[in-house]
């Protein structure tokens, strides 16, 4: 168990700490990271997501429908809870609340999920990990981007009252959502899904070219996350502890309950629950940095979730292995 967790978590911490100390010691500029954000979010991760989905046989994807539904519900529930909590209890604006909600609601299955589930359950679990990435990329991610886009355009102050004002606000949200779907991080997994469903095969030279770009996703994303976090103060406060409780304890518990409610098979229940138990993802922090929205709660919660994750992941691995 210790070796499995070490193999999965030590590389994650190494990447985060490399970026963190590189920024802290001024080896890298932690204030002007837009170019690195563009590389990670518009090239590396989209290539990785596209290949993961496109390379999955259609029959295997069909078997993931129930797991995908469970993951979508799990992500949406914690996203909504986190957004409402930070918006009305912590008094954050809509942009900052969406960044925190995505950080807590979308686990780091990109960097942690693949090695951890492969170590615990074998290579057969990687399809569910790819599904989890696709679900997060086409649900809570575009919602966050829509909120950030709307805030950037100043749509929070839409004029009008009554039905006309509400209609205008809804129209602005819809336009922002459509605009967010133009981003590679959103449409790449959808394109991969289309390739898989159509049984299309990429030429080997294109596959290898995309694989080269996609292979840079994990390391560059972790370094970028650490770099962004290094520009902020890490604070352990009451809301940080609440954030960790929501992510590391509540989300996997919700996942387990939903899996049982929809009668998901034991194997998929284990996968979905353990994916939900992963520490915070980096999409929220990176999206926020791209839109100049950097709530301390997001970065503090992210770091704290990894520190607590060493113990909480071990506990959830034991729990899921006793299911059934």
Regions found by a protein language model. Name each.
Residues 1-324:
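Alpha-helical transmembrane segments of multi-pass small-molecule/ion transporters
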């Amino acid at each position: 168990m210790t070796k499995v967790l070490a193999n999965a978590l030590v590389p994650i911490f190494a990447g985060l700490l490399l970026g963190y100390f590189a920024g802290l010691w001024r080896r890298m500029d932690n204030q002007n990271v837009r170019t690195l954000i563009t590389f990670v979010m518009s090239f590396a991760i989209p290539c990785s997501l596209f290949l993961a989905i496109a390379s999955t046989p259609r029959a295997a994807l069909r078997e993931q429908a129930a797991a995908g539904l469970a993951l979508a519900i799990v992500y949406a529930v914690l996203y909504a809870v986190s957004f409402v909590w930070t918006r009305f209890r912590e008094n954050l604006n809509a942009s900052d609340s969406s960044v925190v909600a995505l950080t807590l609601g979308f686990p780091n299955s990109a960097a942690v999920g693949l090695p951890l589930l492969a170590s615990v359950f074998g290579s057969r679990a990687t399809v569910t990990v790819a599904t989890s990435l696709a679900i997060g990329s086409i649900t809570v991610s575009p919602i966050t981007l829509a909120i950030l886009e709307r805030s950037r355009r100043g749509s929070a102050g839409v004029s009008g009252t009554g039905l006309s004002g509400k209609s205008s606000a809804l129209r602005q949200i819809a336009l922002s959502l459509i605009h967010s779907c133009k981003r590679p991080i959103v449409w790449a997994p959808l394109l991969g899904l289309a390739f898989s469903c159509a049984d299309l095969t990429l030429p080997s030279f294109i596959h290898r070219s995309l694989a080269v770009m996609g292979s840079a996703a994990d390391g560059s994303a972790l370094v970028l996350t650490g770099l962004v976090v290094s520009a902020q103060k890490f604070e352990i406060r009451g809301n940080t502890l609440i954030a960790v409780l929501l992510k590391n304890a509540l989300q996997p518990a919700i996942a387990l309950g939903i899996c049982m409610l929809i009668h998901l098979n034991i194997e998929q229940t284990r996968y979905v629950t353990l994916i939900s138990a992963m520490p915070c993802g980096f999409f929220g922090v990176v999206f926020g940095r791209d839109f100049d929205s950097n709530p301390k709660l997001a970065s503090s919660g992210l770091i704290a979730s990894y520190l607590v994750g060493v113990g909480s992941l071990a506990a959830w691995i034991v729990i899921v292995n006793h299911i059934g």
